[in-house]
A protein has these predicted regions:
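Long, low-complexity or tandemly repetitive, helically biased scaffold regions used
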Residues: 2, 11, 17-115
Length: 115
């Protein structure tokens, strides 16, 4: 049993070493996503208010030829919003799984504290 226990501990230690920096990276990514929200709101407001008139101004040749205009692509903003939404959906699904895991951990912690 001792060899089995040692192997189990080594395996769990390797998991801990693997997961710890990934959690830190995810925290940084999540912080960036929170900051991106404000920019996405600005882009959403632009898309619903001024985008169409800017698009037609470009179509009519009223904008400088050297102006960067990726934002005026018909699907550029929509596709970006869809990707952002999909990330949010994935985060919600992951959040639900994490909450379930947390409940299990809390139950186990209570049981282990009784020993």
């Amino acid at each position: 049993m001792t060899d089995e226990r040692v192997e189990r501990i080594k395996k769990m230690e390797a998991k801990l070493d693997d997961v710890t920096p990934k959690i830190k990276n995810f925290e940084e990514s999540l912080s960036n996503m929170k900051k991106v929200f404000d920019d996405m709101k600005v882009l959403s407001d632009y898309y619903s208010k001024d985008w169409k008139s800017d698009y037609f101004a470009d179509e009519e040749g009223k904008l400088p030829k050297n102006l960067k205009r990726g934002v005026l692509g018909q699907d550029t903003l929509y596709d970006l919003f869809q990707r952002y939404y999909d990330i949010g959906k994935d985060m919600k699904e992951l959040s639900d799984k994490i909450k379930t895991l947390k409940k299990k951990i809390l139950i186990n912690k209570k049981i282990n504290n009784l020993l």
